[in-house]
Amino acid sequence: MQELERKSCDRPVELVKAQYAGKKVIEFYGDYIPEQWIRAIGAEPYLICKGGEPQAPEATLDYSLRFMNPLAATMVGNYLIGADRVMPMADAVVIQQHDCHYGRMTEILEFKGLPIYKVGVPADFAVGISQQYYRHELREFKKFLENLVGVTLDEDKVRENYAKTNKIHELLRKIDELRKVENPPITFSEFIRLNHYTLRVDYDTSIEALTKIYEKLKDAPGAHAKNAPRILMMGRAVAEGDYVVPGIVEAAGGCIACDFLDEAIRPYRTNISLEGDIVDAFAEALYDTRDPQCIFQPSWEIRFERLKEYIKEYNIDAILWYQLAFDEIYDMEYTCYSKWLKELNIPIMKLESSYEYSREATAPLATRLESFVESVKEAK
């Protein structure tokens, strides 16, 4: 894992060298942007995935109301304070437009003169016209890439990248399966880092590293205390760097054995078809048939049925609802889930984060989480 971390941290330096050698650098945000196409056409991708620091969201207040979730605000704030080393040099910044938070933040980047390209992602994902619209947006993105780089997208290379993506997801699923045992050999803090690192590092390096990690983990002892309460973490995202909350839970004796997160994590439960049209294959896997995000509709009942499956499969004792500040749609979904889970006698705790982890803020946060873990222990 240390090698993956090092390569992930070194990625901006690699991009400078690649751009100097004549390659295009494309920074992007979101699962609905086909990174596989960016690599296939000969450009260098870099995912926007940072979070967990209050300075970046605060930097956007001169340009926007404060009522934007901190992950979306961090995307802009890191540029404003100079913490994003890639965005100033990027030949294009591609951002999916799937809700108002990212739409508003994208407008600020446009106002600052950055080379923004938007990919629309309709929220009513089950409707035929929305599925057609998203495919249209992908085809327009393909044209944009070809115009930017100056070559035609090689569809065989795209399928090769789909296959490598599927292999990465297969290995992450195998590691995830180990989390179903009574005492998993990997913590959530480690698992989410694997996701973040492989989102930045090239496919072959990721596959090699994940293969070695799985071989080591499959016979490894448990990484948690005996009879630790098994917790499922659900919400929009645990971004790169936003590791305080899972760290506190694990230090308190909890085991985050499963995750149900919408963004800033590999969609490792999906596979992309290697047959047929590359646009249809990507759209079907990531948009049509994947578990919908909270902000999509209809989704809450679909997601709750999936949640019940995870509770059973992973032998979950409690749910930690990790919500980003000002994410009002997640707040409404939580209201439904708290009622439905009460009927199943599954405890749930909502934790809202604005990425404020000062000593003064962390102390009461730790007390809440430690009390939650202890109460779940007592109820086991």
Positions of the model-derived regions?
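Acidic/His-rich segments in extracytoplasmic proteins that coordinate ligands and/or metal ions
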Residues: T74-N147
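A charged, amphipathic alpha-helical module
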Residues: M1-K24, K143-N271, W300
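Redox- and metal-dependent alpha/beta enzyme cores, enriched for Fe-S-associated oxidoreductases
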Residues: D31-Y32, W37-G52, A56-T60, R236-S299, ...
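Peripheral docking tails and interdomain loops at the edges
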Residues: T335-K380
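Metallocofactor- and cofactor-centric catalytic cores in central/energy metabolism, strongly enriched
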Residues: R6-Q19, E27-D31, E35-Q36, Q55-D62, ...
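Glycine-rich, highly charged phosphate/nucleotide-binding loops
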Residues: R66-D84, I295-K308
